[in-house]
């Protein structure tokens, strides 16, 4: 299980390095889609079935449309790949080398600490009492998001709406 999580994490980091070198919009969108799938697999591997499915449906469902549209608008006759130019290939290799160096440095000095502390988790408790009950963590997290983070949801929705509006206005030519 740990080995699978490690391989998924390496794939996610390699996807980010591949996106940051972005030789062509086609490959950048493809790498983001693959990284989204790998991120959903990491969430599923850690036991978050509901959240992994929601991220998969919302992120990949919405973003594949956006990536398809932007790729169609910005496609070149001969798109540049990661191995087609020395500069792009060197940037990918330097990015991967820096990630490997970071992993080795963290492993050597054991500098990973938990920086998030949940102080009021008790107010999220749904079932208290004698006996057994079965409540998954995912629905509790979704409920907490819409209860305690309602303004975050509103701001996020408004930001997405404004972003779509700006993209439509730019694509229209006004």
From Swiss-Prot:
Domain of life of the source: Eukaryota
Top enzyme class: translocase
Reactions mediated catalytically: a ubiquinone + NADH + 5 H(+)(in) = a ubiquinol + NAD(+) + 4 H(+)(out)
GO annotation, biological process: mitochondrial electron transport, NADH to ubiquinone; mitochondrial respiratory chain complex I assembly
Coiled coil start-end: none
Gene Ontology CC annotations of this record: mitochondrial inner membrane; mitochondrion
Membrane topology: Multi-pass membrane protein
Subcellular location: Mitochondrion inner membrane
Protein's recorded name: NADH-ubiquinone oxidoreductase chain 6
Name of encoding gene: MT-ND6
């Amino acid at each position: 299980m740990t080995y699978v999580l490690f391989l998924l994490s390496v794939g996610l980091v390699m996807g980010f390095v591949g996106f940051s070198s972005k030789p062509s919009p086609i490959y950048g969108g493809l790498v983001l889609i693959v990284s989204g799938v790998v991120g959903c697999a990491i969430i599923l591997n850690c036991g978050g079935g509901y959240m992994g499915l929601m991220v998969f449906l919302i992120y990949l469902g919405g973003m594949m449309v956006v990536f398809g549209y932007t790729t169609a608008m910005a496609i070149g006759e001969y798109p540049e790949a990661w191995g087609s130019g020395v500069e792009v290939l060197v940037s990918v290799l330097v990015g991967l080398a820096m990630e490997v160096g970071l992993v080795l440095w963290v492993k050597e000095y054991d500098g990973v600490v938990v920086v998030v502390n949940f102080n009021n988790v008790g107010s999220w408790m749904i079932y208290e009492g004698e006996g057994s009950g079965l409540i998954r963590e995912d629905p509790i997290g979704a409920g907490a998001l819409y209860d305690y983070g309602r303004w975050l949801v509103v701001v996020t929705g408004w930001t997405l709406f404004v972003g779509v509006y700006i993209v439509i206005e730019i694509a229209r030519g006004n």
